[in-house]
Structure formats: structure tokens, C-alpha cells
Amino acid sequence: MKEFIAKFSPLNFLMLLAAGIINAIGVTLFIAPVQLYDSGISGTSILLSQLTPDYLSLSFFLILLNIPLLLFGFKRQGAVFSIYAIFTVCVYSVAAWLITDVLPIDVSIASPLSGTDLFLCALFGGIISGVGSGLAIRYGGAMDGIEVVAVIFAKPLGLSVGTFVLIYNVLLYMICGIVMGSWILPLYSIVTYAAGSKTVDFIVDGLDSAKAAMIITTHPDEIARAVSEEFGTGLTIID
């Protein structure tokens, strides 16, 4: 038990706490108030929160959709990664709930650019949420269950992880456009996705590229699990 606990780092938990809060700020103050959509499960949660009664909030769907996916990936990704990821998602969900439902804040007014410039909302929302997601990955967790799903199902479908996530988001934005009866907001959401993706790449690789490594192996599952448990970091499997 002590050996297992020793695998976790207080610094990682602190940075994942910050990551969840930062991501919640980006989504609740820049993206959601102007009806834009984040990527992955976060974007799916935003859409569902728009289509359901008010008491089914964004934070409710974040937990409802993300936690089962992260638990589903427990065996593939290892205990350390799964616990870090679940912690991050819970922080993100609670922070989003506090901002939108508890604190005396009118989010539509508090959003600096709400109702004035959709492009800037999309851009800065993507950058801020990208910082949160990047920090989550950098310190061994994940902000979105779609990453776990991609790692598990991309290979059987003959796709890379990045391509799987891209296809999911394209389908998500198409569904948003059809359901909401407008393509303007889904198209602006692509800006959010692009800005977020570039920011994640910069946070994960750009600040410390010397520690990036590619491992070529015929046993990806075993190595991914061992590296995740030993170093507390996330991995991307490229087929």
C-alpha cells in the first residue's frame, strides 16, 4: 500500500487542481455563455446541458459522462493515471458548478467578451481551456474521457488517436449544428478546438521538449501501463 501511495506526487495533485480550475474558467466564462462548444466530452456536456432542464447542469454531465469512461480505461492506462484523471475531472466539474450555480456571478455578464465578439470568445476560451488540458496531461492526468476512449478504440478501427479525436469532434460539431439549427456557433467552435489543441501541444511539448520521447515496441499496452504507473505521466499510442 505504501509503495502504491508513493507513486503519487503532491505537486502533481496541486497542478491538476490548478488545471481543473483553469479549464473551468475558460469554459464557463468564455465558451458556454455564448453557446460555443468545447471539444470532446466537455463539448458533448455543453450540448446536453443546453437541451435539458436547468437542474441538469454542465457539471452534472461532465461527471456523468467522464467518470465511467475513465474507469473503463483503468486497466489500459493504469491506476495512477486513472486516479489523477478522475481527480482532475472532479475538480473541473466542481469548479464549473461553483462558477455557474453557486457563486453570485452572472456568467453571461462576467464573461469579458460575452455577446460582443464570438471570435475572441472562441479564441481565448480555447487558449485558456487548452492551458488547463495541457497542464492535466503534463502532470499525469487528463481533462477529458475522450482521450481514454481514443486510446482504446482507435487501433481496432485502424485510426491514430489524433484522428479518432478529430473525427469525434467533427461529428459533435455537425450534431450541434443540426440540433441547434445554426452552423455559425459550431463553426466558431472549430476555432476554439484549434486554439485549444495548439495550446495543449505547447504546454505538453513546447516548454520542455527535451523530455519528450518516442518508444518503439511490440508491447505498447504493457509499456504504457508501466510508464504511467512509474512516472505518473500520460502517453499517446501511435499505430
Feature annotation, model-predicted:
Residues 2-221, 230:
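Core subunits and conserved enzymes of cellular information-processing
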Residues 156, 234-239:
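Cytosolic Rossmann-like ligand/nucleotide-binding regulatory domains
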Residues 221-224, 235:
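Hydrophobic structural segments
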